[in-house]
Each structure stands twice: as structure tokens, then as C-alpha cells.
Design a protein with these regions (language model features):
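Acidic, surface-exposed loops and disordered segments
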Residues: 1-171
Length: 171
């Protein structure tokens, strides 16, 4: 497991290559198995592979971030996993655990993944609420967390060094 963690990186460019459904399913399964407060398991994953929906979400995300028109905040990845959670004081924490599990399982599956922010703000907009409605969820009951983008990297791996002096012991 530690090798998987050490070798994981977040590419900024993805190949225009389809991701196998079985691999997507395994990544999602890992997210759904993340720990959650009181084991309520209220986090959800919306898997977006529809090109039009994905591109509209990318435009919304870029707009929220103040990116110039035409910039793809999903870096060309064909799969966007939008993590949301039932409204709760633990939404961010539970959702973050789901995202971390999915990032690691993507690496395990030979995929590349990146955590993309602004999910909360997206689902506060009418466009974001429509995504929840598309899958039959009540937008008033869910808050956005963030995204995991999946695909195959178009870059050489760049493993970053761990910054020193970040662990302290009390014995």
C-alpha cells in the first residue's frame, strides 16, 4: 500500500482514452468503503462520462475558479467523479475520506487521478442542482464536496519529495 501512496501523482494532462468501466467501478467502490462519521455512509458519487454534461460542469468549475474561458479544470480527463454528501456537519470530512480512497484505488488500478476543488460551490448553483436532479436526488438534501478526475496521464510521472519537519513525537 505504501508503494501505491508513494507513487501516486496528480497529472495535469490526460490522454483522450476511454477508461474501462470495471476500473471506474473499483475506484467508486473504494470511495464508498471510506470511513464515515457514525458509519452513516451518506456520501454519494456521481460518475460523469457523458461528454456534454462533463464539459458543462468543466465550464461551471472554471467560471467559479475565475479561469479564462476555454481552460479545462478537469485537464482533459474523460471521467469526473463528483462527490456529494447529505447535508451534515461531517460532509467535508466524510467526503474527503471518500476522495482519498478513490485516489489511491485509481493508482492501484493503473489509472491516474487528481482531486479537483469547487464541488461545494458547483452544487449551490442551478446548473449544479440540475446534476443532482438528473440522478433523482433532491438538491436541498445534498452538499457538494469535490471531484476525482480519472484517466490515463499524458505526462511523465513526477513523484514529489515529502517536505521535512512535519512529524513531531511526544513520548
Amino acid at each position: 500500500m505504501l508503494d501505491c501512496i508513494k507513487n501516486r501523482y496528480s497529472p495535469r494532462s490526460y490522454l483522450n482514452k476511454e477508461v474501462e468501466q470495471a476500473k471506474i467501478d473499483e475506484v467508486i467502490s473504494a470511495g464508498l468503503r471510506a470511513p464515515s462519521g457514525r458509519d452513516l455512509q451518506q456520501g454519494i458519487v456521481i460518475c460523469i462520462t457523458n461528454k456534454e454534461v462533463r464539459n458543462n460542469l468543466a465550464k461551471l468549475n472554471a467560471s467559479i475558479a475565475g479561469m479564462p474561458e476555454g481552460v479545462d479544470p478537469f485537464y482533459g480527463a474523460r471521467v469526473v467523479l463528483l462527490v456529494a454528501h447529505k447535508v451534515s456537519p461531517l460532509s467535508d470530512l466524510n467526503g474527503a475520506a471518500m476522495i482519498e480512497n478513490m485516489l489511491l484505488e485509481a493508482q492501484n488500478q493503473g489509472l491516474h487521478a487528481r482531486w479537483i476543488n469547487r464541488g461545494k460551490k458547483e452544487l449551490e448553483t442551478s446548473e449544479g442542482k440540475n446534476i443532482l436532479k438528473m440522478v433523482g436526488l433532491n438538491p436541498d438534501e445534498y452538499v457538494g464536496v469535490d471531484h476525482v478526475i480519472l484517466g490515463y496521464s499524458n505526462e511523465e510521472p513526477s513523484i514529489k519529495e515529502v517536505k521535512p519537519n512535519r512529524v513531531f513525537y511526544i513520548k
